[in-house]
Amino acid sequence: MQILTRLIVSFLTISLSFSALANFKELQHFGQNPGDLGASYFATQAQSKALVVLLHGCAQHGEQLAQQSGLLGLAKEHGFALLIPQQRLMNNIKRCFNWYSDDDYTKDKGESSSIKNMITTLQKQLGTESVYIIGLSGGGAMASNMLVNYPYLFEAGAVVAGIPFPCADDLITGISCMKNGPSQTIEELVSLTRNLNPKQKNWPQLSVWTGTKDNIVAPLNSSIHAQYWAQLSHIKTKANVDKQEGYVITRWQNAAKEVQVELVEVIELGHGIMVNPNIKNGGEESDYLLASPLSTAQHVINFWGL
């Protein structure tokens, strides 16, 4: 009887997963694809005003992450579109985005260029007015890259268990950055970013997430990332620290008293994206999807005003 029950549960889980993935359509003909990435998307029948880009972590399937994190359910609930760039095994044996490779992180080259072309193509196809980006781990590092290379494309972003860009220029410095934080100072990161975008005045809103026990990507990366982005955004006021049971949120406000940058530190959790299965579209526990008082997807969508 127990074996039969487990088989039924497994069957239902697989069926639900395939059902969720069936919501996505392949994105074809999005222009040049120098990074040789795949892409799929979800959109409601009605025209979507917003497009959210999700960049998965290593060894993950982007569509499954969208479903398990609660982001797909939120897209259906709030009526925004989802774009899922997908790494291919032939590009990286662990299916990580190559965020540390000069061939892929440089503006208008490799994977960075491919993702930009996906965004602009789908944005035109769907008629979306605004674009947002969220990434987990290696996808978080790539999201950092996209926000720096193409800040004009995005209203806002979220980097979860990731690192700031530019932090690494090869695999060795990439590993060092993951374990020890950036070798650059906050001021140097700001200067490098401004030099890449000399005409950019306004920067995307940013939400940065880490678990305080993350032993894969040092939490120091998130702290530095938030401080660097606040300085990049010309924020002069002191940050506000909000301590809650199980997490701490530090917020930096711009001159209009709007939160421009936030750092969410979840106490005693490791490497992953936070989910709260107890709330609607709060996500479900799995590998690198960690039960928490907060749902990252739910919180970020609210933070962005979607």
Question: Model features per residue range: what roles?
Answer:
Residues 57-61, 269:
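Active-site glycine-rich loops that stabilize anionic/oxyanionic intermediates
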Residues 216-221, 274:
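Conserved alpha/beta-hydrolase "acid-adjacent" motif
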Residues 54-57, 84, 265:
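Structural cue for short, hydrophobic secondary-structure segments
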